[in-house]
Amino acid sequence: MSAEIIASIADVLTDNIPLTPISQGAEAVVFTSPVHPYLPKNRTDGDDKLYILKYRPEKKYRHPVIDKTLTKHRTLGESRLLAKLRLIDGLNVPKLIGCDPYHGCIWLEFLGEDLPNGHGFSNLKNFLWMNASDPYSDLVRDTMINVGKQIGLMHWNDYCHGDLTTSNIVLVRAGEDWQPYLIDFGLGSISTLVEDKGVDLYVLERAIISTHSSFANRYNLWVLEGFKSVFESHGKAGLGKYKDLIRRFEEVRLRGRKRSMIG
């Protein structure tokens, strides 16, 4: 991560808020901080509480006016989407804490933890690697079904993620189980199109195949089992929507295979 990005976020924040960078993508940099963005100075919300700061730095290759407009639009769009998703009963997404669209900043609650024995952070990808010695256990099965239910809830309410990889599904411990949370809605949208929902499912399927190929067929079947259960709970109309969506998902999958063959 460049010193320039670190300096730019330091100029935006006040009071020398401590930040630890954890990831950097094409559009944004993600930090953790023990300091709440708008509680009184030097006060934290719990001794071990962490927060997420997602920061969209300035893009030097864009005209400054265009860059500021895009940053404001995308930051506001993601924040509004998260706020709406939080209203859906049963859907697990991070709580929005604060938004500064003019500087490209979104503050969120921190979710997840370090997995035991050095298996890394508790996203779905690392969780499946951690359980590779017992890939078909009840714990893995139930977790994958719950992942499917979360995606089903999102799609039933006509929201799409846009980048549904195993790294963008965080697992939070709930007793002996793990509850999946969908994160990073930078490419998220409101959409009634089965094409957009089919692409979400295809992206996740490919992500699972690419990192857990030996067990991917079973994992993806469990995801679809949970996904289907959400639509089935809405009766005949829900089942009809599910069939339309899966039909399009299979078309998206076929197109993806053709592209892979052609290169």
UniProtKB/Swiss-Prot annotation:
Q: Indicate whether Disulfide bond appears among the record's keywords.
A: no
Where does this protein chiefly localize?
Answer: cytoplasm
Q: Could you state one GO biological process linked to this protein?
A: tRNA threonylcarbamoyladenosine metabolic process
List, alphabetically, the Pfam families matched. Kdo
Location in the cell? Cytoplasm; Nucleus; Chromosome, Telomere
Query: Has keyword Phosphoprotein?
Result: yes
Which residues does the Swiss-Prot or TrEMBL record annotate as the active site?
163
Q: Which residues bind ATP?
A: 22-30, 54
Q: Which residues form the Protein kinase domain?
A: 16-263
Domain of life, source organism: Eukaryota
**Domain topic, free-text comment:** This protein is considered an atypical serine/threonine kinase, because it lacks the conventional structural elements necessary for the substrate recognition as well as a lysine residue that in all other serine/threonine kinases participates in the catalytic event. BUD32 has protein kinase activity in vitro, but in the context of the EKC/KEOPS complex, the catalytic subunit KAE1 switches the activity of BUD32 from kinase into ATPase.
Query: Could you describe the subunit structure of this protein?
Result: Component of the EKC/KEOPS complex composed of at least BUD32, CGI121, GON7, KAE1 and PCC1; the whole complex dimerizes.
Job of this protein:
Component of the EKC/KEOPS complex that is required for the formation of a threonylcarbamoyl group on adenosine at position 37 (t(6)A37) in tRNAs that read codons beginning with adenine. The complex is probably involved in the transfer of the threonylcarbamoyl moiety of threonylcarbamoyl-AMP (TC-AMP) to the N6 group of A37. BUD32 has ATPase activity in the context of the EKC/KEOPS complex and likely plays a supporting role to the catalytic subunit KAE1. The EKC/KEOPS complex also promotes both telomere uncapping and telomere elongation.
Name of this protein? EKC/KEOPS complex subunit BUD32
Q: Which organism is it from?
A: Kluyveromyces lactis (strain ATCC 8585 / CBS 2359 / DSM 70799 / NBRC 1267 / NRRL Y-1140 / WM37)
Q: What's the encoding gene here?
A: BUD32
